[in-house]
Amino acid sequence: MSIPTPYEDLLRDVMANGTHKSDRTGTGTRSVFGRQLRFDLAESFPLITTKRVHFKSVAVELLWFLRGDSNVKWMQDQGVSIWDEWADADGELGPVYGVQWRSWPTPDGGHIDQISELMTNLAANPDSRRHIVSAWNVSELKDMALPPCHAFFQFYVADGKLSCQLYQRSADTFLGVPFNIASYALLTRMVAQQLGLEPGEFVWTGGDVHVYDNHVDQVAEQLSREPYEYPQLKILRKPDSIFDYTLDDFEVVDYRHHPTIKAPIAV
């Protein structure tokens, strides 16, 4: 029985069908528009195996988002530097993901904690079609070091299972997408546990789905590799709140992967 390879198939799609486009960074891309991947979180945890994905960085970044933080110092203290290229001299990034998730400003000077409201509403009214969190705050985009690439996500409850769909407006398919898939799969598992639900699907939807011109050789190397089965994720503790998880609460089991493939980041 062959191993499903939705992510690798997406890479092949971009390489075969992508249109060459210029971009903000000046690097150049091959790009397609409007793609979707699905992952069954009840079966496994979608950590890509054709190269190593650094799970610690995935988890630390997600916990940082949930803190509502805008400064890279907390991540640096955990040994994670993935946002350093965009931070200013003081480590500030402006009102990026976590700020919007936890402290979306209102016209009267208040703030909305979208994650707290999400958890409350999922518990009280699981069949609602409004279980949505947005990081795309048009009025604050100019103040962000980097406008949100993964901009908008929605949860869905059916038959005791929690599913999540992410809309990613800009998808760096080689470097970013494996990370984003793992991050939102992890978030879905965490939210499901807090609500006493089983994990359902994670659905990834991409807008401008691209491979940078300086990643083409790396993609070719990755696609030459045979995939392994996805690992399992164990969550070792159920804290009192979605905001109380720590890195030690997560254990990835049976993660068999090919070596890391390094590539430059387009800043």
Curated annotation (Swiss-Prot):
Species whose genome carries this gene: Paenarthrobacter aurescens (strain TC1)
Main location, first listed in the record: cytoplasm
Top-level lineage group: Bacteria
Binding sites annotated in the UniProt record for (6R)-5,10-methylene-5,6,7,8-tetrahydrofolate: H54, D172, A266
Homology family: Belongs to the thymidylate synthase family. Bacterial-type ThyA subfamily.
Gene3D superfamilies, per database record: Thymidylate synthase/dCMP hydroxymethylase domain (3.30.572.10)
UniProt-listed Enzyme Commission number(s): 2.1.1.45
GO biological process, one term: dTMP biosynthetic process
Active-site residues, as the UniProt record annotates them: C149 (nucleophile)
Subunit structure: Homodimer.
Positions annotated to bind dUMP: R24, R129, R130, R169, S170, A171, D172, N180, H210, V211, Y212
Annotated localization: Cytoplasm
Top enzyme class: transferase
The reaction(s) this protein catalyses: dUMP + (6R)-5,10-methylene-5,6,7,8-tetrahydrofolate = 7,8-dihydrofolate + dTMP
Pathway(s) served: Pyrimidine metabolism; dTTP biosynthesis
Listed NCBIfam families: PRK01827.1-3, PRK01827.1-5, thym_sym
GO cellular component, as recorded: cytosol
Functional note: Catalyzes the reductive methylation of 2'-deoxyuridine-5'-monophosphate (dUMP) to 2'-deoxythymidine-5'-monophosphate (dTMP) while utilizing 5,10-methylenetetrahydrofolate (mTHF) as the methyl donor and reductant in the reaction, yielding dihydrofolate (DHF) as a by-product. This enzymatic reaction provides an intracellular de novo source of dTMP, an essential precursor for DNA biosynthesis.
Record-given protein name: Thymidylate synthase
Keyword tags: Cytoplasm, Methyltransferase, Nucleotide biosynthesis, Transferase
Molecular functions (GO terms): thymidylate synthase activity
InterPro entries: Thymidate_synth/dCMP_Mease (IPR045097), Thymidate_synth/dCMP_Mease_dom (IPR023451), Thymidate_synth/dCMP_Mease_sf (IPR036926), Thymidylate_synthase (IPR000398), Thymidylate_synthase_AS (IPR020940)
